[in-house]
Amino acid sequence: MSILNVLLSTDQLVVTVDTWAEDAVSGQASAGAKVLLIPQHQILLATRGSAQFFLRIYQLSLEASFRADFTLEQLTAELGRVIDQLWPNYAKAVAEAGLPAEYCTTELVLGGWSPKSGRMMATAYAKHDAAEPAVVQPITGQLSSPGEPLQDWPPSMATPDLFEAGRRQAQWLNERSGRKVAGGRLLLGFLQQGQAVVKDLGAI
């Protein structure tokens, strides 16, 4: 699994993810893009879980962003249904590849600037079971996944604190799994009105 953290204020959105990725069949390690921008609208998508599923969601969201009537609110409302519609084919592909059911899981965050509301907005989506609809949860201040290693760590948008939080999470996940499942480099997605930036904070 991966690292996915979100800090939200009225005028700023900060997301951090790790870059550790591995091929589900061969196990070969690589670096993955788990936070991607829709920069013309100051919007980002980030993930913890299946990279292939995330890239499909990003592709559809990016295509939608070209519509003349596009709004963050509309994409936010549609995304849960889109996840549910795509899930059967994804689950089928996982089964046909002979992969364990644990690969059928995704956590996504959609966030960005809302001209309509005059503030930053973010929503979390989770899907684990084809029989149940995607869980959709508005983010009001913060989200940490995994949250266990940060129970005693106060939320902060300061870069050193974001880096330390990611380092703690990667260490916790790797120790819990008995192998490397998180790490690589820590990427930071930063949004404010008129600005959409991704920064590399370094190796964790």
Regions found by a protein language model. Give the residues of each.
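Conserved short S/T/G-enriched processing/targeting/catalytic segments and their helical context
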Residues: S2-K92, D129-I204
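Hydrophobic, aromatic-enriched interface-forming segments
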Residues: A101-D129
